[in-house]
Structures are given as structure tokens and as C-alpha cells.
Amino acid sequence: MRLFTGIVFCSLVMGVTSESWRSFFKEALQGVGDMGRAYWDIMISNHQNSNRYLYARGNYDAAQRGPGGVWAAKLISRSRVYLQGLIDCYLFGNSSTVLEDSKSNEKAEEWGRSGKDPDRFRPDGLPKKY
């Protein structure tokens, strides 16, 4: 219900017409799929230092969908950062290495959302399928 309310509010604020609203919602759903694929690749790649690249790639792919994709990428990225921060704080306390890693991941996500090439963060040795 909150998601629906948020989408309606965003459409009112942005002055989106009914046709644009449908395309915004479609782009957002496609962006969710792009982000989900990136997070799935993070889980199965099991490659050291691949997180930043895959975060950037997921945000880049979602942003290529349009404004709805950018909105979905921001929402998912911020939710992940918030939840990961809570879990890290609970399990590890306030660690400076956790904070640095979180900041670098956020930088990679913003890089991807801005439409810049995510290959900047690609680690050596990561298989081509990613």
C-alpha cells in the first residue's frame, strides 16, 4: 500500500500524464528486474571485489530504462544501504572499514545511475558473463 501511495504521490509531484504514468511504472518494474539481476549476480559470482562493479552495473541498467528505472534504482539502493547499515551496526558495531566500504559502494551506485560506464569498477578476472 505504501509503495502504491508513493508512486501516486511521485506522479502527482512530477505532473506525469496518464500515459507517462504507465511508462514510468513500466520502467520502474524493469529497473527492479535489473537491480534484482545485479544482486543475484553478486550472490552467485563469488568473486572478490565484484560488488562495486555489479552495483554500478545494476544501477546503470535500471537508469537506461528511463526516469522510472532511476527512481527504482535509488529506492532499492537506499533501502539496501539502510538495512545493511543496521545489520552491520548490530553485528560489528561502528566499524570504519564497514563505513568506507559502504561509501565506496554508494559512489559506484551513483556512477551507474548517472549513465557513466560501470566497467570502471570491473575487477580483474571477473568472468565475461557478468
From Swiss-Prot:
Cellular component GO terms held in the UniProt record: extracellular exosome; extracellular region; high-density lipoprotein particle
UniProt main location, coarse: secreted
SMART domains noted in UniProt: SAA
Documented effect of changing C89Y: Confirmed at protein level
Known glycosylation sites: N94
The keyword Membrane appears for this protein: no
Subunit structure: Apolipoprotein of the HDL complex.
Protein name, as recorded: Serum amyloid A-4 protein
Organism, scientific name: Homo sapiens (Human)
